[in-house]
Structure formats: C-alpha cells, structure tokens
Regions:
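Alpha/propeptide regions of enzymes that mature by internal proteolysis
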Residues: 1-387
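Acidic, Ser/Thr-interspersed intrinsically disordered low-complexity regions
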Residues: 424-431
Length: 431
C-alpha cells in the first residue's frame, strides 16, 4: 500500500507553473498557519455534548501577528452561498482584511469568533473605544457526518492553541485543525494547501491557496482531469457514503503580487474554476466561499497622511495569476485528499482514505497520453521563478515584456503594426 504522499509525488500533471519552496500558502512571505485538532471518543452512537468528537480550528495569520494595525488589501467571492464566512461583507465593502482568518465547523463559528475577539482585545485594548470594533473572519463547513457538531466542542483554548501554533514552512494537511472531520467526494479530506511561483517574466510573484475541503460525490471526482471518481465509485460501491449533505469548501488565497481589492475579487473567482476541476458543481446546499488578500500593500491603521499610495499590478498583467490560482486550488484540494487517512466517528460512520495505489495505477495507465503533451511536475530543472516563457505560443498571443504604454489597455496585447510589404516575386509573370 502506498504511504500517504502529496498529490505531486504521485506524478500527476498539475499545471505548468512551479510551486514554491514548501508548496504551501506559507510560501507567501509573512503568512503563518496553525492548527488545533480535537479527536475524542471511540466511534459509535452519537451522544450530543459528549461525542464522538472529530473537529478543530485552523488559523491563517496574513502578516504574522499584526494584521489589526497593518491591514492588507482583501477580496472575496461566493460561488454558492449555503455557507458562512463571518466578517466577509466588511472585507468586501472596505477592501481590507484586519483580522486573522479562522476555519472551523459550522456550529462553532460563534465560539471561534468570540474567542478571536477576546484575543484581539487583549492585544489591542483600544478596540471599541480608541479603535474601531472588529468582526473576525471565520469560515465554516459541516463536519456532522463524523463529529458531534451540536456539542460545540471548540473552545477559546483551541483558538488560542491554533494561533500559538501558527508558523511558516510546511503546513500539516488532511485531518487536522478545522479539517479534522471533513470529507471530499466521499473520501476523507480536510486541510490542503499549494502554491505557485511565477516566472520572472510574469513578475516573479508567489501565490498560495489553503482549503478546508468538504464537498462532492465520489463519481464526480477528477484527478488531473481524469475521471478517477467514476472508476473508484464502481470499485467501492459497497461502501456507505454521506447522503444527506453535499458539503462545502472554504478557500483562502494569499499573494505578494500588488493587487487591489477589485483585483482580489476577480482572483477569488478563478479559485472557483479550480474547485470545479476536482469535480464540484456547487450544489444547491453547498457553500463555496473564497477569501483573498495581498501582502504587497499595508494600509496602516494609524497615519497622519490624507492620501496613501499603493502599488498596483496592471489589470492586463494579471492573467498568469488567474491561471496559477486555478492550478494551486486544484492541487490544494488533492493534497487534502492525499494526506488524510481513513476515519470513523459519529454512529460508526466510516470514511475511507483516497486509495492512492488505485489512483497511481489509473494515472500510470494514461501516462503515454501525458507524455505527448506535458512533462511531469518534477522533470524541469530550472529554479522556480527563473523559467523562460512557458511556451513560444504564449508570446505570440501576449507580449508580457511590452511597456504598458505599448499595449491596448484592457486587452494587454501589442498595438498592431502595418505588415511589411511582401518581396516582389520575379517569377510571378511566368506562372
């Protein structure tokens, strides 16, 4: 049996842009991630308030620990709104992020928000008097298939633990933190993350995605574009599955590209395309909610300036980020599946791990096709961020090295030039 590995280690073709050092949202400088995982009680009958408990909290700190005073540009997108991210309307209205982002189960949003508010008031006693009030950003998914969700077992201590555990570097994935009880396409999933480092010709920016993945049905699962779910659904049709809920997904996008709020809103929309790549169709009862931020511009809470200047990546230069965020989202979801192990919980419900051996065999069977169109992710030896243009055809459609004044505004392509007259054909009269 294959050990649990990340999706990239299965040799999957996961896009043309390279990941960052850790292939995680923490590759964006200053972003920290921490978890608090709660697993109590043996699998068995549900006893509300007692267990079994399979839940937790994940904390994303956008610029280490000072997001309240050094706010960042923020944005969001809601594909289907049968879910919740508290504080999201303010992020969209102001275009600013001013609290950490926390992820947990549906019925613990209030407790986590209250705990985060308490922590921030301790750190900044002027909140509510000297400073504005805050609305912590807390996202949720329903983990009730495995967890005693009505018992509301997440406490302030767990929020503090997740914040204290937040660090840079590799991010634990799968059944950890807020993802402890989450399921994707009828397999155990949870937290997953991935990143992309753009080549210097596209700005050299880093972009990372972290998901709490909890959506879908097995037959819809696609891995690197392959209908793996249909294959596995037939082989595993004897296994019980979650039937009363389609689930949801919360995604967090971070980048060091200098994007303004309207651009972050647009970037978040492309995350939804990445979610669709793995098999989501955003069902009636699901919630696909995306929050994004850029670390490139800090908006200080205290300043004597009336006008504050911010850097801006021109809209016609954003396309590579759109492509990269789709790739990173797809890989983050697959990483959540690849990392998670089987779990049992409420009422003895069992959720299997994604069978990596079967996935590998399915992918290997199609490898001759991949070999004709793409390299596997680890074949290129050029360091991330230093690659030439990914392919010659791209330069023909879009000259990234042209000065902004040399391109048509919204289209981002060179102004047309009059073609040179063809050389005279001395033999033309002889035909």
């Amino acid at each position: 049996m294959t050990a649990r590995v990340r999706a990239r280690e299965l040799g999957l073709p996961l896009g043309r842009f390279k990941p960052g050092k850790h292939n995680a949202i923490t590759d964006v400088a200053g972003v920290l991630v921490g978890h608090s995982t709660i697993i109590r009680g043996e699998p068995g009958p549900l006893t509300p308030g007692v267990g079994p408990v399979r839940t937790g909290v994940t904390a994303i700190l956008p610029n280490e620990s000072n997001i309240f005073m050094d706010r960042l540009a923020g944005g969001a997108f809601v594909l289907n709104g049968a879910g919740e991210v508290s504080g999201l309307t303010q992020v969209v209205e102001w275009g600013l992020l001013e609290t950490p982002i926390l992820l947990t189960n549906t019925m613990s949003v209030g407790a986590v928000s209250d705990a985060m508010a308490r922590v921030m008031v301790e750190q900044y006693p002027g909140i509510g008097s000297e400073h504005d009030v805050i609305i912590p950003v807390v996202g949720e998914c329903d983990d009730s298939y495995l967890n005693d969700i009505s018992g509301r077992h997440v406490t302030e201590a767990h929020v503090r633990e997740a914040l204290a555990n937040a660090k840079s570097g590799p991010v634990p994935e799968g059944s950890v933190g807020g993802g402890t009880g989450m399921i994707t396409c009828d397999f155990k999933a949870g937290i997953g993350t991935s990143s992309r480092k753009l080549p210097q010709v596209f700005g050299g920016y880093t972009l990372g995605v972290l998901v709490m993945s909890n959506f879908g049905k097995m037959h819809n699962l696609r891995v690197a574009g392959l209908p793996v779910g249909e294959f596995l659904a037939e082989k595993l049709k004897h296994l019980p599955r979650r039937m009363n809920s389609y689930g949801s997904i919360i995604a967090v996008v971070a980048t060091d590209a200098p994007l303004l709020p309207h651009q972050l809103n647009r970037l978040c929309k492309r995350v939804a395309l990445g979610i669709g790549r793995v098999g989501s169709y955003a069902a009636h009862g699901s919630g696909e909610i995306i929050v994004g931020f850029s670390t490139a511009n800090v908006v200080p809470r205290r300043t004597r300036k009336m006008v504050y200047k911010m850097k801006l990546l021109l809209d016609q230069r954003v396309d590579p980020l759109y492509e990269a965020v789709m790739e990173a989202t797809e890989e983050a979801i697959l990483n959540s599946l690849c990392a998670a192990t089987s779990m049992s919980g409420v009422d003895g419900h069992e959720v299997p791990a994604l069978p990596l051996d079967e996935v590998r065999r399915f992918v290997d069977a199609t490898r001759p096709i991949f070999a004709t169109v793409n390299k596997t992710p680890d074949e290129a030896a050029v360091p991330a961020g230093q690659e030439p243009l990914p392919d010659d055809s791209l330069q023909a459609e879009f000259d990234w090295r042209a000065k902004p004044s040399d391109v048509r505004s919204a289209e981002g392509i060179p102004f047309p030039t009059r073609p040179a007259a063809p050389p005279a054909d001395d033999d033309a009269d002889d035909e």
